[in-house]
């Protein structure tokens, strides 16, 4: 899966996959760093359950690697990454973020739902094997495709991390039904075609909206002027793919 050797795909949802990663890799007294545009339920989990269990957190600017570097300290045991960010779709310099985490000895976990393993390879970001430690994915979205299945995955190349994740997965009692598995497996062969079709349609609509007088800004990583566009181009240029998600900012008068 996504070029990784070890995978846990029996997650009942994408959020369950996120929770499994945080619960497996953090303990009381640790600190986790999260981008300020992270998936909302991940923030809620961090501010709620994790905080109650003595795990602190800081939010960092995903477009400023120096800000992330300044926040890493001796208590930092996990850095969450998102490319692109949730809702506002800023695209970070993911390569430099991962280089920083590895240089500082901090585990980094990517929410790779947006890229779906197609826009870029999270385990080979630079063509030379630089990759995240763990990639989580809401299979509910693009892999399922039908909107009728909840499922998630956690993927790693690290055997020690895989064991931690596997034990947490077992202790939390995560499981999924065989019918849901069948539905996702049936949809996987068409995933590349569907993802590309979503991308084409979204870009066409985004460009149309960009010319509307009501629209102040279109937030789409593949469009020039969108925050982090250069980072998207550097990372996803070989595939020229982007998900079918974008946001718009309306002028106040509208």
Segments the model singles out, each with a brief description of its role:
Residues 5-214, 219:
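Conserved PLP-enzyme active-site core in the AAT-like
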Residues 1-3:
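Conserved PLP-binding active-site segment in aminotransferase class I/II-type PLP enzymes
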Residues 203-254:
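Conserved small-domain helix->loop->beta segment predominantly found in fold-type I
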């Amino acid at each position: 899966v996504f070029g990784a050797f070890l995978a846990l795909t029996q997650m009942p949802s994408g959020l369950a996959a996120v929770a499994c990663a945080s619960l497996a890799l953090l303990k009381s007294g640790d600190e986790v760093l999260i981008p300020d545009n992270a998936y909302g339920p991940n923030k809620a989990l961090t501010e709620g359950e994790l905080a109650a269990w003595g795990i602190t957190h800081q939010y960092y600017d995903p477009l400023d690697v120096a800000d992330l570097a300044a926040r890493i300290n001796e208590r930092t045991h996990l850095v969450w990454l998102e490319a692109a960010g949730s809702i506002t779709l800023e695209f970070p310099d993911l390569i430099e973020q991962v280089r920083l985490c590895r240089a500082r000895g901090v585990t980094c976990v990517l929410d790779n739902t947006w890229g779906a393993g197609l826009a870029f390879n999270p385990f080979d970001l630079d063509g030379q094997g630089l990759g995240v430690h763990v990639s989580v994915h809401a299979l509910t979205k693009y892999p399922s495709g039908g909107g009728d299945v909840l499922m998630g995955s956690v993927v790693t190349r690290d055997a020690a991390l895989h064991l931690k994740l596997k034990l947490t997965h077992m202790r939390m009692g995560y499981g999924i039904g065989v019918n849901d598995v069948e539905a996702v497996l049936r949809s996987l062969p068409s995933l590349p075609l569907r993802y590309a079709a979503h991308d084409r349609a979204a870009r066409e609509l985004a460009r149309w909206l960009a010319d509307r007088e009501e629209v102040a800004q279109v937030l789409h990583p593949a469009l020039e002027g969108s925050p982090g566009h250069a980072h998207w181009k550097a990372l996803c240029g070989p595939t020229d793919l982007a998900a079918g998600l974008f946001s718009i900012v309306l002028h106040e008068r509208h």
